[in-house]
Amino acid sequence: LKIKDIFEKKRLVFSFEIFPPKTTTPLERIYETLDELKGLQPDFISVTYGAGGSTRDRTPQIAMDVKNKYGIESLAHLTCVEATREDTEKIVSFLLDNGVNNILALRGDPPEGARDNFVKGDFEHAIDLVRFLREKYGETISIGGAAYPEGHIECDDPIKDLHFLKQKVNAGVDFLITQLFFDNELFYRFMERAYIAGINVPISVGIMPVVSKNQIERIVTLCGASLPQKFVRILHRYADDPRALEEAGIAYATDQIVDLIAFGVKGIHLYTMNKAHVARRITSNISTLREAVPDPKGEKVLS
C-alpha cells in the first residue's frame, strides 16, 4: 500500500520514525522497539539513514522487516549524500523486491566531521533525487519529501525556501513530512503560505517529544528550531530532573498534537528516538482523538 493512498483514505494518519542502531549495536535492539510500537497501530513507520548514510546497509533491511515481519507499511529514507545513481537503483530494487514501495527522499547530512569535505555523489539536492526516482520508477513508488515550517537552516529567505518546496512537489513528491517544531503558530503560518503557493499534497506534522537535556541541545544545533517561552520555562524548571523533564516533554508534545488535530492536520509523525515507552504514552494520551476525528461540519468520522 502506498502512503499517498493512506492519506486519501484516512482523515488522520498517525506514524512513527525510528532509526537503525549504530553498526556496533546488535539489530535485535531495534526489533525490541518495533515489538512495542506494533501494538500502537501506526499507519506507517519510517526508517532513517544515519549522517552520511552511516547506517545505509541497515535501513533497507529494517524497512523490509517493518513491512513483512510486522505487517506495517514502511517508509525508507533515502539521501543524496555520497549516493550514486547505481547505488540508489540497487537500494530501491531491494526495497521493491521486498514489498517496500514508499521512499522519503532527502538531501541528508554529511558524515560527522566532514561537512565541508566529502564526496557529494550524483545528487546535490533532494529535488535531484526526487526527479531521478520519479523518472526511473514512475508510479510504482510513493515519494515523500521534507518540509521546513521555520525554513531550512541553510536558507534564510522563507519565500525562496517555499519556492524550492513547490519545485520539489512539482518534481514528483506525493506527501510531505515536516521538520520538528515547538511553536504551532509558526506551523499554521507556514500552512497558510503553502496554500497560497499552491502546495496541495498532504502534509504530516513532525513532532519530537523532548525528554532529555542533551536532546534539545542537539535539536537546536542541527535544525535551528525556535523555542517558545512556554517551552523554555519547562527546560529551565526541569533540566536537572530527568524523570520530571520526560514527563513534561510528553505533556508538551501531547498538547501540541491535540491543538494540531483540532486545526485539522492530515497527519502526525512522531519522532520516537527509538523510545517506545514515550511513543506509547503519547499514543495513549490521544487515543480517543485518533479514533474519532471531527470533520469540518462537526460530525465524527473514523480516522
PLM segments and residue spans:
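Active-site-adjacent beta->alpha loops and helix N-cap segments on the catalytic face
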Residues: L1-I6, T25-L27, G53-D65, T84-K90, ...
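Conserved N-terminal beta1-alpha1 strand-loop-helix module at the mouth
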Residues: L1-V47
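Active-site mouth loops of central-metabolism enzymes
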Residues: V13-R29, S74-E86, S142-K160, R237-A251
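Conserved, mostly hydrophobic/aromatic
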Residues: E17, I45, L95, K168, ...
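Active-site beta-loop-alpha junctions enriched in small/polar residues
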Residues: I18-P21, T48-G52, H77-A83, G108-D109, ...
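Active-site pocket-lining/capping segments in soluble small-molecule metabolic enzymes
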Residues: G121-Y148, I196-I250, D255, I286-S303
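Active-site/ligand-binding-proximal alpha/beta "capping" segment
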Residues: F132-I177, A251-F263
